[in-house]
């Protein structure tokens, strides 16, 4: 026994000496300690984070919702009524509270990604479902049965909402959806309706900062390339400082043009037919560019060179799109083609090209309509398969350039803060409008969800705990109307009670005017896609939180430990850097 203890002590001394040598000769690796919370305590702390975040977000809901001012790391504070912007800005010092808040942010982001709006509604629903779920689990309900009940109820509500949705098509209906999502600003709704009318459902509508006090709509018909002329000597209209080419030949080349000899044949083709020439290539190097300018100034050849838009694979795709639109071919080494062998059939053409210092607009390309449609179909398929938001955005832009055009909403205002706040609302309104066109509309102001709660009373369940799960959703569906009314300064419970007493499925509370109206006739409507996505995402994350039994987070590092870690190199003293 003594020998065993002696050996153990000896091994301990050796290990200790080894650790001391190691601490003097090498950096130590520190692992963060973890804190674990269980059961009711864990859920209560997460709920606190959810409630605090939801309280900040819900004040923006409805036509009389308030602004939230957000401090930024640089520049002026941001003023916004956009729910997802408020949610993203919130971080808590308490890590477990932060876990709850982060999951609500996930709901808001998911809803925003799919539907583009409804983030405030999703946040309010998440808070309501999770709060009731926590109470029920604490009272002894089976968490998994609650989750099944919640899931059954959500499926029933979604089916009910889909059966009541109405498709929209007119500009007036589109304007109504945009107006509601822009917090009642009619001008924004009408601007979006005009933009959609101009470019169609598949057209791209972009939002930019305006340079005036007013909102403006600029529509670019045809294909717009975000590249301008390579030299101002190509300008043909001194008044507008643009190069305008009527019925031009278009050379589309994938590589750089380094010598004039390579494009002599193309210049001869243009001169022989007395037609202008547009050159689209990766670049035109100085010698070739100088020769083109001399030909324009002295020989009177109308010519203009621009750089190919995009980079890498995206550039190739853009050039292929341009070739399809203009009826030309992309001259590329990969297919064994070179500029010396170009003939007229390889050149594209269009009705008119306008080139400024920043961009190029190609109108009425001569490409085969069937070929253009096939190209559009390829892009649509790529959009469906893509998992990258960036790639989807670029593909959508390409589709718009080929099929409809591009509309630019220029948002004006008296200050940077005002423009930023308006851009948030316009973005929400635009996304909601697209969602409404896609899946249809429902009576707005939260009443579609409120009346769907009635349908759950007859929903069959397997046991009492599942029934409680259904009741949790029933109660949560009342919160959007309650919150909108409360933000308008009236008692939310009274409004909810009065609406549930009557049978008209379109009757709701107009918080802007303070009266009960037919929501559809009054133009207060919500897109089905927005409401459906908000409810499904909220229920999904709330169910996960309700069935959580443990939370693991990093413990904050103690200052004394940090100091000790820094002193671990004591044996290396005297080495100053």
Swiss-Prot record:
InterPro entries xref list: Chaperonin_Cpn60_CS, Cpn60/GroEL, Cpn60/GroEL/TCP-1, GroEL-like_apical_dom_sf, GROEL-like_equatorial_sf, TCP-1-like_intermed_sf
Organism classification: Eukaryota, Viridiplantae, Streptophyta, Embryophyta, Tracheophyta
Induction record: By heat shock.
GO BP, sorted A to Z: Group II intron splicing; mitochondrion organization; protein refolding; response to heat
Span of the transit peptide along the chain: 1-31
PANTHER family linked: 60 KDA HEAT SHOCK PROTEIN, MITOCHONDRIAL
Family that this chain belongs to: Belongs to the chaperonin (HSP60) family.
Residue stretches spanning the membrane: none
One GO MF term: structural constituent of ribosome
Primary subcellular site in the record, as a coarse category: mitochondrion
GO CC list: cytosol; cytosolic ribosome; mitochondrial matrix; mitochondrion; plant-type vacuole
Signal peptide region: none
Subcellular location(s) per record: Mitochondrion
Organism: Arabidopsis thaliana (Mouse-ear cress)
Gene name linked to the record: CPN60
Biological function: Implicated in mitochondrial protein import and macromolecular assembly. May facilitate the correct folding of imported proteins. May also prevent misfolding and promote the refolding and proper assembly of unfolded polypeptides generated under stress conditions in the mitochondrial matrix.
Protein's UniProt name: Chaperonin CPN60, mitochondrial
Keywords assigned by UniProt, alphabetized: ATP-binding, Chaperone, Mitochondrion, Nucleotide-binding, Phosphoprotein, Stress response, Transit peptide
Keyword Protein transport: no
Phosphoserine: residues bearing it: 151
